[in-house]
Amino acid sequence: MRRAYRLRRPEQFRRVRQEGRTFTSPWLILTVAPARRRTLRCGFVVSRRVGGAVQRNRARRRVREAVRLLLPRLTAGYDMVFTIRTPEVIDAPFTQLQDDITALLRQACLLPAPTNETVSPVSDTPLPQHERGSQ
C-alpha cells in the first residue's frame, strides 16, 4: 500500500478514534472518520493478544493486503483505522478475511453494493460484451 494511503502519526490515529464511528466484526474493529483531505487513508493496529511481534506483523500484512485490493472501489475522503482483535486473522483463509473486511466497509457505507456485471478476475473492470459468453 502506497505511503499516501496510510495513516502514520499517532495524532492521525487519535483523531480518527475520537471523531470516528466504529464498526465491529469478530476479527476486526473498523473506525472511520471524515478526512481533512480528499484521499482515503488507512491505518492498522494489532492488539497484543494476537501474539508476538512476528504474528502481529503477519496479521497486519494480511489485513493491509486485503484492504489494498479493495482500495480502487472505496469512497474517498475518509480516514480508517483497522484494529485486529484476534489471532484467528493469521490462519483464516484469505477469502474469508476479505469477506469480513468487505462486510465492515459496506456497513460503513464506504464500499458500494455489488453490481450484476461480470467482472474480470484480473481487474475490477467489466469484461467486454463479446468475452462474457466464452468463459
From Swiss-Prot:
GO MF term (any one): ribonuclease P activity
Chain residue ranges for the region called Disordered: 115-135
UniProt entry keywords in alphabetical sequence: Endonuclease, Hydrolase, Nuclease, RNA-binding, tRNA processing
Gene Ontology biological-process annotations: tRNA 3'-end processing; tRNA 5'-leader removal
SUPFAM superfamilies tied to this protein: Ribosomal protein S5 domain 2-like (SSF54211)
Catalytic activity: Endonucleolytic cleavage of RNA, removing 5'-extranucleotides from tRNA precursor
GO CC, one annotated term: ribonuclease P complex
EC number: 3.1.26.5
Broad enzyme group: hydrolase
Coiled coil: none
NCBIfam families from the UniProt entry: rnpA
Physiological role: RNaseP catalyzes the removal of the 5'-leader sequence from pre-tRNA to produce the mature 5'-terminus. It can also cleave other RNA substrates such as 4.5S RNA. The protein component plays an auxiliary but essential role in vivo by binding to the 5'-leader sequence and broadening the substrate specificity of the ribozyme.
Record family assignment: Belongs to the RnpA family.
Oligomeric and partner information: Consists of a catalytic RNA component (M1 or rnpB) and a protein subunit.
Protein name: Ribonuclease P protein component
